[in-house]
Amino acid sequence: MSSTLSSHHAIALKASNLHLQLGGKTLLDNVDLEIMSGQITALLGPNGAGKSSLLKVLNGEIKPNSGSIEIFSRPKDHWPSELLAKHMGILPQHSTLSFSFLAHEVAELGAMPLAISNHQAQQLAAKNMVKVGVDHLANRLYPTLSGGEKQRVHFARVLTQLSHSGKQCILMLDEPTSALDLAHQHHTLEIAQALSQQGAAVIIVIHDLNLAAQYADRLIILNQGKIQADGTPWQVLTPTAVENVYGWPVQVIAHPEHNYPVILA
């Protein structure tokens, strides 16, 4: 199933016929996809649907068995890695470090592709730690942080990495709210939303359908490695579609203030 194309957004990323098979299991089954600048695209689906596999193929962590990827109309393989790092940032679900860095040093790692001075890197990382709300953790040892704190420090790192991306910016988030409390879930997604409003293409793997409906411009439901639905939250989150994919009956109502769909299970 091919993606829908909006006429007033440029294509940031285009994937054609992506096929991925690991251990004899098909994880992606000839997926075609166009990701637009200036939008948040949420990848949804049950466990094992192919969401994280798709994100890892798109960001180059996993090489597909077949298919092609273009980033800003240029084949992904033609991008020098250091140049691509300025324009595409990835926040994985789990980030591990084997050294006892201070939290601000982790955030400063994002400046490595930017060719700026150490002082500029420190200032940039400090600014993004404030934005994410982890500036009070700057001098804490990274291994002593909670899972949610680590995730937010890495978000500051990714924002630092993309600081010089200009108009060509892709942000990929793999379950960015999984370790966060309610307030930090919304704060993280508000930052992603602000970036998209500035022109970035944002791709989020997320399980919470209500958060996806609230913040994403476009929802893509995957199941068994295929795109099952693709459109606006109201187009995608119908009771029938949700029950068919997740195997659970739901009701869908409109949020009383903001009119996005709310799922009641």
Curated annotation (Swiss-Prot):
SUPFAM superfamilies: P-loop containing nucleoside triphosphate hydrolases
Keyword Cell inner membrane: yes
Gene Ontology CC annotations of this record: plasma membrane
Residues that coordinate or bind ATP: 45-52
Location relative to the cell: Cell inner membrane
Recorded GO MF terms: ATP binding; ATP hydrolysis activity
Known EC number: 7.6.2.-
Keyword tags: ATP-binding, Cell inner membrane, Cell membrane, Membrane, Nucleotide-binding, Translocase, Transport
InterPro entries: AAA+_ATPase, ABC_transporter-like_ATP-bd, P-loop_NTPase
Function as written in the Swiss-Prot or TrEMBL entry: Part of the ABC transporter complex HmuTUV involved in hemin import. Responsible for energy coupling to the transport system.
Family: Belongs to the ABC transporter superfamily. Heme (hemin) importer (TC 3.A.1.14.5) family.
PANTHER family recorded: HEMIN IMPORT ATP-BINDING PROTEIN HMUV
Stated name of the protein: Hemin import ATP-binding protein HmuV
Gene: hmuV
